[in-house]
Design a protein with these regions (language model features):
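Class I (Rossmann-like) S-adenosyl-L-methionine-dependent methyltransferase catalytic domain
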Residues: 1-26, 32, 37-88, 132-204
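Non-membrane alpha-helical structural segments and their capping/turn regions in soluble enzymes
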Residues: 59, 111-115
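A short acidic, Gly/Pro-enriched loop at the edge of an enzyme's catalytic core
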Residues: 87-99
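A short SAM/SAH-binding and catalytic strip from SAM-dependent methyltransferases
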Residues: 98-112
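Flexible, active-site-proximal loop/turn residues at the rims of small-molecule/cofactor binding pockets
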Residues: 105, 117, 137
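A short glycine-rich, Lys/Arg-flanked "PGG" loop and its adjoining helix->strand segment in the class I
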Residues: 115-127
Length: 204
């Protein structure tokens, strides 16, 4: 029997897929995508009956994610998909066992907003829950980025991003009261940009 993996998993981030393969995200968990876009990471979760919530400030993206849910998991209420920013989210505290933040935090214009976004993300996570973050970093391309001030950098690919590094993420993990589940891993894309995977368990 041939399985259409694309139809089954959608365009899920490969590092998020790794968390599924390792049994860290299992049916029955409440999953919130904090910056869902059009729902690229949600197709499998919706199809498999996870309790999914999602937010994004882009109304077109949120409507696309709602449409995906209507098709794959019609029992999920439309109110589970909200047009809002994570720092001002109306979802209740500790409402998710897994919070996904995939390519979101590096769009912060300064450190104050980055920290507000991160705290807003963390607030949604229940004790013992898993935070999955993918975000831009300077790791491995330190000599190729141009500082703009306040942890904002110009990258070789022509974009400007808020960049973290390993020491900053380690410090943030401790400040949040979390524990690294995996070593901090970074993919350098041909000297143009670096994307770091940061997976944290919320203690307590």
């Amino acid at each position: 029997v041939r399985t259409d993996l694309g139809a089954l998993f959608g365009s899920i981030d490969v590092y998020l897929f790794d968390q599924l393969l390792r049994g860290r995200i299992v049916p029955g968990m409440r999953v919130l995508d904090a910056g869902c876009g059009r729902g690229r990471n949600l197709a499998f979760l919706l199809r498999e009956g996870y309790e999914v919530r999602a937010l994004d400030p882009d109304p077109v993206a949120v409507e696309a994610a709602r449409a995906l849910a209507r098709r794959l998991a019609p029992a999920i209420p439309e109110s589970s998909f909200r047009r809002e920013t994570v720092e001002d989210s109306t979802f209740p505290d500790a409402c998710a066992d897994v919070v996904i933040s995939n390519a979101v935090l590096h769009f912060a214009p300064d450190e104050a907003i980055f920290l507000a976004m991160l705290r807003g993300t963390w607030r949604l996570l229940s004790p013992g829950g898993l935070l999955f973050c993918r975000l831009a970093s300077s790791i491995g391309i330190e000599g190729l980025v141009r500082p703009l001030g306040g942890r904002r950098f110009s990258l070789p690919d022509g974009t400007d991003r808020f960049l973290v590094d390993e020491a900053y993420l380690v410090d943030l993990t401790a400040e949040l009261g979390g524990r690294l589940l995996d070593p901090i891993k970074t993919t350098v894309v041909q000297g143009q940009r670096a994307m770091t995977t940061w997976v944290v368990r919320r203690e307590g």
